[in-house]
Regions:
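Conserved structural motif at the start of ABC-family nucleotide-binding domains
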Residues: 2-4, 17-19
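Short coil-to-beta microelement around the adenine-binding A-loop and adjacent beta1/P-loop entry
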Residues: 14-15, 74, 182
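The feature captures the beta-strand-to-loop junction immediately N-terminal to the Walker
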Residues: 33-35
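ABC ATPase NBD Q-loop/coupling interface
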Residues: 59-75, 143
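ABC-family P-loop ATPase nucleotide-binding domains
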Residues: 88-165
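Walker B catalytic motif
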Residues: 168-172, 179
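Conserved beta-strand-loop-alpha-helix hinge in the C-terminal portion
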Residues: 210, 215, 219, 223-246
Length: 248
């Protein structure tokens, strides 16, 4: 599904990613961990298509297409979803209007018929019930006045509605209490299937106790220096990153 080969990325002429390679197949859940400044958020921003991140080498393919040649909007149309650490607030725009606009943009990109207000309302009722979310979430302005947990619920709702093939969560657990963490984990777990993949970018292991990724990678100085299964998470919890960084 996603194939990253020898990726090099710079920000303001400073090299951040220095030869990162990663393959993600359908249905897999990968965790990207690492100390501060290792390049985790740079990887997320590059996959999302942020213009201020300059790719200086390597390739990124998504479902066989050159991802780096696609605009952020087209990447969303192809099936990539990004949940940011700090979701944007949009005053005056209701969640329902925002989600219908986003979904119909994706459907138009794929050559599918757009949904009218009534069909979309039926879809929303289905998703709200599935995720056990309060209905008033739909009438509120996007993320305005939301608690940390509510913002994460909104991310999960967006994923459920848009049904992306690859979901990237960029430090979505940052600053969250245990209840909000469970909101994120429960949402991710409810959307896991044999086709949808996840990349969980995090500095801490606590959210991974609930999501339990199949693959865990440690990023350091712009490269993946260690990969393993969930036992690597426990090892990092006990020993930190020092034993890995000292080997580099």
């Amino acid at each position: 599904m996603l194939s990253i080969k020898d990726l090099h990325v710079s920000v303001e002429d400073k090299a951040i990613l220095r030869g990162l390679s990663l393959d993600v197949r359908p249905g897999e859940v990968h965790a990207i961990m690492g100390p501060n400044g290792s390049g985790k958020s740079t990887l997320s921003a590059t996959l999302a298509g942020r213009e201020d991140y300059e790719v200086t080498g390597g390739t990124v393919e998504f479902k066989g297409k050159d991802l780096l040649a696609l605009s952020p909007e087209d990447r969303a149309g192809e099936g990539i979803f990004m949940a940011f650490q700090y979701p944007v607030e949009i005053p005056g725009v209701s969640n329902q209007f925002f989600l219908q606009t986003a979904l119909n943009a994706v459907r138009s990109y794929r050559g599918q018929e757009t949904l009218d207000r009534f069909d979309f309302q039926d879809l929303m009722e289905e998703k709200i019930a599935l995720l056990k979310m309060p209905e008033d979430l739909l009438t509120r302005s996007v993320n305005v006045g939301f608690s940390g947990g509510e913002k994460k619920r909104n991310d999960i709702l967006q994923m459920a509605v848009l049904e992306p093939e690859l979901c990237i969560l960029d430090e979505s657990d940052s600053g969250l209490d245990i209840d909000a963490l469970k909101v994120v984990a429960d949402g991710v777990n409810s959307l896991r299937d044999g086709k949808r993949s996840f990349i969980i970018v995090t500095h801490y292991q606590r959210i991974l106790d609930y999501i339990k990724p199949v693959y865990v990678h440690v990023l350091y100085q712009g490269r993946i220096v260690k990969s393993g299964d969930f036992t690597l998470v426990k090892q990092l919890e006990e020993q930190g990153y020092g034993w890995l960084t000292e080997q580099q």
